Amino acid sequence: MKKWVLAIVYGLLAVSAYAQPKGVVLDTLKVQHIDFQGQPQQGIIICNKAISKDLREIFLELYKAKYPIERIRPISEYGNDDERSMRANNTSCYCYRVVEGSTKLSKHAQGLAIDINPLYNPCVRRKKDGTLLIQPATGKPYVDRSKSFKYKITERDLCYRLFMQHGFRWGGAWRSLKDYQHFEK
């Protein structure tokens, strides 16, 4: 049986198919960012209160450096559909879901992980049949990290460095899969 939760987030009606995990306290952050047209925008991040100070500081530094992030909206604006949010290149944090292919809650379900410019920094894993699973599927042109293209997160990137300074782990450094968009604590 599904639980339906209604929440008002800065005037937006957010409907989630599941409640947040027990003991998780979520916070709503308004952050400034520079979009791909070079214009300042205000984004909304739903995150675990335990990382809200870190995220506030990181996004302030990214904003000061004019680091481009296309959009930052709650996943509820995409019907809580992670693939749809990633295809729109939406940077988001909290999303109540399990780790792909398991029953374990993801760090996103705890509000402890954030995905940055996910279209250009896809999650890539090899399936048992040897084929690649690319998320978002439209991120296929950005799988080859030896190519040069805009908005790519690497170990030399400011976004990477700021998250590392704040004690986050980067999915792009994982061995089992590569999740270039993903930072978690």
What do the PLM-derived regions correspond to, one by one?
Residues 84-119:
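Mid-length scaffold segments of soluble, non-membrane domains
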